[in-house]
């Protein structure tokens, strides 16, 4: 065999030695990957419910903090002198950590907490983004290098005014009462009612999966963490609404589910009864949740991204009933607060939004289009 032929077709021993070397290299790569992917390099920690509840006790919550009781989020705690000062609840999609809502904690420590979180995330190849962040943090985030886009407005119902916006619902309220519907409030839902409300929830979902980001879901421990209002007809549970604790002066509602064949007005019936409960508990206002894309990009001088959202709001009814959602809240709302999506400079708005949409779409029903699922959860 010539030397040239030997170089092209080496002996079996050479091939075997090469395979051994390749195998060792692959094992080394696997070991390196496992080391880099180990928990020592993960950002944040899993839910530690008592630690999280302590933060809410000391600093009160936000409009998103109740959702963060679900064990599907990661938590980054900023500390000083070994004491928790600020916590961020987030989920990861791609290279983004999507923080849900406002930071929770000491107001004086928010800025250094965000800065440290950004630095720690950057070391691990992540970028921070905030979803449904309130107006009071927009300027701070801009100074820290974030771009932002408005994604809608949250409606607030004042519970202290003499003329309540929901008084107009009294005729519907009385009609349903006369038809045998009655409301009961439980500070903690009795165990014996779990099966009944679970049945309502299953029928309301109609085969769809629960979402995993930015909303609550039917979960036993989650349901027992706050008050629940139940509506019955002839002793049968036909609907329920759950309390969403926020602060000493404000509360919202989370799950509002009724059986499919019940009157459409039953949702209003549950809301009106909840308002009465909140008044008795001393709350000053009720958070009615987000009206997606409401009052976004309405002028000719608005940012391009917000102009696109405005077009979707006006002509995207085949995706989601944006305008009817806004109008349904409008009957109760006394003021609106803007909510924003903030993402770091250097990020593509298109790709950051796509990653957010994919995250929101987790758990979607197969028969629903991806676009519809995304826009439902904006």
Q: Predicted segments — roles?
A:
Residues 1-12:
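Membrane-interfacial helical/loop segments at transmembrane boundaries in membrane proteins
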